[in-house]
Amino acid sequence: MAEASAAGADAGSAVAAHRFFCHFCKGEVNPKLPEYICPRCDSGFIEEVTDDSSFLGGGGSRTDNSTATHFAELWDHLDHTMFLQDFRPFLSSNPLDQDNRANERGHQTHTDFWGPSRPPRLPMTRRYRSRGSTRPDRSPAIEGIIQQIFAGFFANSAIPGSPHPFSWSGMLHSNPGDYAWGQTGLDAIVTQLLGQLENTGPPPADKEKITSLPTVTVTQEQVNTGLECPVCKEDYTVEEKVRQLPCNHFFHSSCIVPWLELHDTCPVCRKSLNGEDSTRQTQSSEASASNRFSNDSQLHDRWTF
């Protein structure tokens, strides 16, 4: 018992010989032992004040511009977001931090130094625990924390079927890599779709079949019925020379030949020069392209941006 009292007295005298600054209270405090936490807000985000510290002597503006203060504000903001709940077990791996979570839940039932409007306290961050050292552990840089949080967003789970630790907490309905993020991702999807559907139409007609199409003369009876070219929509005149397809549709030669050089089909009835219906062939080609696109999506877990 006497040894414990002596140890406590030695620890108290060691703390009294040093000055500590709480980044949440933004003031000088005398930390609680042996956890080294702030007596006002129960936060472990405290730091020993040394001769080169600017926490107390530099005024409020220098404190607000310090990296540690910016990190505290960032952490305070992320603490109240929905997805940070999943990150806490991975950002706080120290057993002492896990033990203090139960104590913090108990402290949240009453108001503290900041009054009833103060939001819930933050999880314990890296603390000053070493009695022999003269400098506390420095908090990690803001960039490192952000990289640690967002590094796993687009990574696949190491175990198939198991949720990734850096998940979106159910906000997304599938892997984030399956989504189109930004204009670049959308352009990649459209480009792949166009590439799959590029050659799904009927193939070009044979040149021999195109040249063998008969050239006929428009009669007065056809003109009286209002016969026109289905491509350019111009009315035919009597004795005008036009090309006749096997489906008995008439076209200007300058209108139908360029089309047949690209597609072996009638622009009106979609029948080929052989008299076969090309609609079924087109549907079969589109279904095949859709299956290829689906297979490609399954092979690639996420888009490459």
From Swiss-Prot:
> What EC number(s) does the entry state?
2.3.2.27
Q: Which reaction does it catalyse?
A: S-ubiquitinyl-[E2 ubiquitin-conjugating enzyme]-L-cysteine + [acceptor protein]-L-lysine = [E2 ubiquitin-conjugating enzyme]-L-cysteine + N(6)-ubiquitinyl-[acceptor protein]-L-lysine
Provide the GO biological process annotations.
negative regulation of epidermal growth factor receptor signaling pathway; negative regulation of toll-like receptor signaling pathway; protein autoubiquitination; protein K11-linked ubiquitination; protein K48-linked ubiquitination; protein K63-linked ubiquitination; ubiquitin-dependent protein catabolic process via the multivesicular body sorting pathway
Record-given protein name: E3 ubiquitin-protein ligase RNF115
Q: Which gene encodes it?
A: Rnf115
Its keywords, alphabetically, are: Acetylation, Cytoplasm, Cytoplasmic vesicle, Endoplasmic reticulum, Golgi apparatus, Metal-binding, Nucleus, Phosphoprotein, Transferase, Ubl conjugation, Ubl conjugation pathway, Zinc, Zinc-finger
Sorted alphabetically, which SUPFAM superfamilies does this protein's record hold? RING/U-box
Give the knockout phenotype.
Deletion mutant mice exhibit resistance to RNA virus infection such as ECMV and susceptibility to DNA virus infection such as herpes simplex virus HHV-1. They also display a significantly reduced infection/inflammation-dependent tissue damage after pathogenic bacteria S.aureus infection.
Q: How is it modified after translation?
A: Phosphorylated by AKT1, allowing association with the 14-3-3 chaperones that facilitates associating with TLRs.
**N-acetylalanine: which positions carry it?**
2
Any idea which residues bear Phosphoserine here?
133
Q: Name one GO cellular component term.
A: endoplasmic reticulum
- Subunit details: Interacts with RAB7A. Interacts with EGFR and FLT3. Interacts with BST2. Interacts with STX17. Interacts with YWHAE.
